[in-house]
Amino acid sequence: MTVQGRDGGDLDGFHVGWVPEGAGELVSDFASEWEDVSFASRVWERAVEDGYRVDLRVHVLRGERLTTLLQVRDFLAGYHERDSAEWPLAEFGRGDGVGLTGGGEAFWLVRPGLAVDVLVDVDRFDAEASIEVASSIRELPLG
């Protein structure tokens, strides 16, 4: 079976190896910071009748407070204004480690201080697409 999609390019030291077919062609990169964590973000969006709709977001997160997967979860819960205790997440395999996924979002701790977060529009794609995108992301070699 061939999974249709395209390459997502490089973002802040990572390569996004797969973007689902049907993700918008308008691609934008952003840099931001929230609660002492820096975000390097790439967004795929498409034009809709009343403006634009985001289909896929990939965030590379850097910050001293991101030392464990549970701390990444708590940080993202605050960022998304969710109660981390009420956020239904499940583990997914990520190389020799695990990440957490739920509701079209997949994230993992690369190492202390560095995490990656993937979000897909669940009205456009199956929630599992976030895991497929996450599984395609590789850290680039230094230098």
List each model region and its residues.
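Short, solvent-exposed recognition patches
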Residues: 1-112
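Surface-exposed amphipathic alpha-helical segments
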Residues: 114-143
